């Protein structure tokens, strides 16, 4: 590798590359979530017949992974670069390898392996065939071909490529700690994120009000159901995301037992499934507007 890209240059390079492949560049969704997959730009758009090609950076919060800013590789919040393409192009893996070359990683000079790792997200009723991508022994990306999202079978098949930006940047810049990553010229990752990492870890593990969080979960669940009764998919899904993050905070605090944990996951999954079904129904009412006219008319005629 010649020039060592900064963190933001890595993002800009990936944005330009996937833009050139026909992806819309979306912005991070403004609700807490544990992974880029949970953004409505993936969760909702992966279902139904309409095409969808998008790429975006998604800050992902995992309270249980916080380490007070002291662990060089474990974070309360990390950043994913998410690419979702429906229908999946036949050469998506080749495209991915080309993107690595643009980041200065020559596949012919490195040990790049696709290790089978089928993916499942129980809290959203989602699963798919998947591979971890290992670069010289370190996982940097997750590949998934969605089979089910929100309890619904996907069709056409959606491919998802999720880059772990911190790991990728650590490798490209040859640093052992994420906090030593150069975010921009002269500015280190740690100078931006060490303090919030410490504070969020302290809050998640020591300070959070368990009673309040339990009450909030109940309120968010009720509000999601109320929105769904009115056919309001996106407000409902916002509250599903709030339920998920609230559960993650409770889990990090040790406030839920093993049995209770399974119950909370089931409640979130049940909501996510209703959201998914309602979304497809609402898109059908709109006539699946992202489909080309010929396909749209044919599909609507078949379903009627």
UniProtKB/Swiss-Prot annotation:
<dbReference type="GO" id="GO:0005829">
    <property type="term" value="C:cytosol"/>
</dbReference>
<dbReference type="GO" id="GO:0140096">
    <property type="term" value="F:catalytic activity, acting on a protein"/>
</dbReference>
<dbReference type="GO" id="GO:0005524">
    <property type="term" value="F:ATP binding"/>
</dbReference>
<dbReference type="GO" id="GO:0016740">
    <property type="term" value="F:transferase activity"/>
</dbReference>
<keyword id="KW-0963">Cytoplasm</keyword>
<keyword id="KW-0067">ATP-binding</keyword>
<dbReference type="InterPro" id="IPR002310">
    <property type="entry name" value="Gly-tRNA_ligase_asu"/>
</dbReference>
<comment type="similarity">
    <text>Belongs to the class-II aminoacyl-tRNA synthetase family.</text>
</comment>
<dbReference type="GO" id="GO:0004820">
    <property type="term" value="F:glycine-tRNA ligase activity"/>
</dbReference>
<keyword id="KW-0648">Protein biosynthesis</keyword>
<dbReference type="InterPro" id="IPR045864">
    <property type="entry name" value="aa-tRNA-synth_II/BPL/LPL"/>
</dbReference>
<keyword id="KW-0547">Nucleotide-binding</keyword>
<protein>
    <recommendedName>
        <fullName>Glycine--tRNA ligase alpha subunit</fullName>
        <ecNumber>6.1.1.14</ecNumber>
    </recommendedName>
</protein>
<dbReference type="GO" id="GO:0006426">
    <property type="term" value="P:glycyl-tRNA aminoacylation"/>
</dbReference>
<keyword id="KW-0436">Ligase</keyword>
<dbReference type="Pfam" id="PF02091">
    <property type="entry name" value="tRNA-synt_2e"/>
</dbReference>
<dbReference type="InterPro" id="IPR006194">
    <property type="entry name" value="Gly-tRNA-synth_heterodimer"/>
</dbReference>
<comment type="subunit">
    <text>Tetramer of two alpha and two beta subunits.</text>
</comment>
<keyword id="KW-0030">Aminoacyl-tRNA synthetase</keyword>
